[in-house]
Amino acid sequence: MKNQSDAGLEARLTAPLEIMLASFAPIGIEGRDLVRRSFSGAPQHQPSGAAIPMDPERNQARLVASGWIARGAMLNDGRRQIIGLSLPGDVIVASGSVDADLLVWALTDVVTVDATAFWTTLSEPGAQVSPLSEAWRRCRTAERLRMARQVVRLGRLNAYERTAHLLLELHERQVRLGTARGGALHLPLTQDVLADILGLSAVHMNRTLQQLRRNVLVDYRTGRTLLQDLPGLVQAANLSAVCGPLIPPP
């Protein structure tokens, strides 16, 4: 039987996931308790830049309790392309050959916890329908939508549009977590990392951020960024509604 200290630790580790799930659909006390019971093992701490150990042989999943994680590819000449970001509350999974050529690493100091039981319970075919499973289904749909957005960003948008759209997407995600207030955005990403996400050179990234600042849309600082004009950024992103709403949920 778990003692009070263990239960308190689990609640802190799973709090971002609980908040995010509840932003998609009510999960209730029963759903919250199931989330907390679904995680096992000691939390793992990795410093910024470290690889996140995953075991694809057993489709291991991990919950991001704190910090930011990148998934992407490293080219032979040292260039990187980041294809996805995992924030607190996200669950990452090693899916064998699908991710064989991708790296997963910490962009900041991170804490993760084994989420394999949670992933198996809710993601397997025939999983019991419940308020929690519905929230998880919507969460996974949003994740797939983010991947589609990234493809459109890299394939069809210019640097200005890409940057505006990425910042809006990160703001939307943080509103769901309750960590964004107004236009204030937690952004622990350097310009080099932003360039790796958006497929730009460091020089082009810097010029684009300066242009957004001159247009009084974004005040960028590593660690904390202010989105000064959300409707203006939506217009600058120049994406149709087919790629999903970028106005944060209430």
Predicted segments, located by residue:
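Cyclic-nucleotide recognition modules
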Residues: G84-R149
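Polybasic "coupling" helices that flank or enter modular domains
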Residues: P131-I197
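Cyclic nucleotide-binding regulatory domains
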Residues: A50-T108
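ATP/adenylate-binding site constellation spanning eukaryotic-like Ser/Thr protein kinases
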Residues: S66, P88, D109, Y160, ...
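Phosphate-/nucleic-acid-contacting segments
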Residues: R173-P250
